[in-house]
Amino acid sequence: MDFLSLAKKRYACRKYTAQKVEQAKLDTILEAGRVAPTGANRQPQRLVVVQSKEGMERLARCTRDFGAPTAVIVCADTSEAWTRKYDGKNISDIDASIVTDHMMLAAASLNLDTLWICMFKPEACLLYTSDAADD
């Protein structure tokens, strides 16, 4: 499939089956995120894969999950990201967006649908990036 066809195929899916994402497909999606370009190749992205029932229930406290069996939370370490010297712009948000887009297109190439969710409670998501996640 050519790139434009792939880009047109990807859409914001809001209804999912309970079928688990195969590990090989998930690995391909995560690899697409790993090789995504980032400012000065700093790779500030941090990915949290959520697949367990308990994890998805915890995630539901942060945002609506639309019944998806798997979620990838894309975060970025601002201390690791490149900063533009002229105005001090830290591009961690841009890097995270590029990584997310690469993974979503990889998923589409594997016939998996995705949804980019930006409507979430940041304080609730901290549970996934702190020691509290282990409690």
Region spans (language model):
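Short catalytic-loop micro-motif centered on adjacent basic/acidic residues
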Residues: 15-16, 46, 113-116
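Short Asp/Glu-rich motifs
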Residues: 25, 52, 126-127
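Conserved small/polar residues in nucleotide/adenosyl-binding loops
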Residues: 128-135
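Glycine/small-residue-rich phosphate/adenosyl-binding loop
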Residues: 30-31, 35-99
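Specificity-determining recognition surfaces
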Residues: 1-25
